[in-house]
A protein has these predicted regions:
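Cysteine/selenocysteine-centered motifs that mediate thiol-based redox chemistry or coordinate metal-sulfur cofactors
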Residues: 92-119
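CN hydrolase (nitrilase-like) catalytic-core segments centered on the catalytic cysteine
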Residues: 1-86
Length: 119
């Protein structure tokens, strides 16, 4: 399980997390900060830099992704909460069979990796 805390909230971040899940054959828990304008105390002047009527400074978008890259919980957008998901550890094996990043199914008859040590 990869825990990936972030401030980032865009759909691109979620796609990156889906890629990480597939490439690593692992579950990803993407925890994104959700913060409202009202969460900032009035004593901080920078609070006024946010436009009027904007409730959320960062809407969060936390999610849980399985090893096949599928979102199995969330995204939790513009709300506070806790995400839960039942995970099947067999999914890890299935995912790693489909996408082998370390090359267990590489073809030694086609590809050869060697290092010259005499130079």
């Amino acid at each position: 399980i990869l825990a990936a805390p972030t401030w980032h909230k865009s759909p691109n971040w979620q796609m990156s997390m889906q890629h990480n899940a597939r490439e690593g054959g692992l579950f990803v828990v993407s925890t994104c900060m959700a913060i409202r304008k009202d969460d900032i105390p009035d004593k901080y002047d920078f609070k006024n830099l946010y436009p009027e009527g904007r409730d959320w400074i960062n809407p969060g978008n936390s999610c849980i992704i399985d090893p096949k890259g599928q979102v199995i919980a969330g995204p939790l957008e513009a709300e506070e909460g806790i995400l839960y998901a039942d995970i099947d550890l067999n999914t890890i094996t299935e995912a790693k069979r489909m996408f082998d990043v370390v090359g267990h199914y590489s073809r030694p008859d086609v590809f050869n990796f060697s290092i010259k040590t005499n130079q």
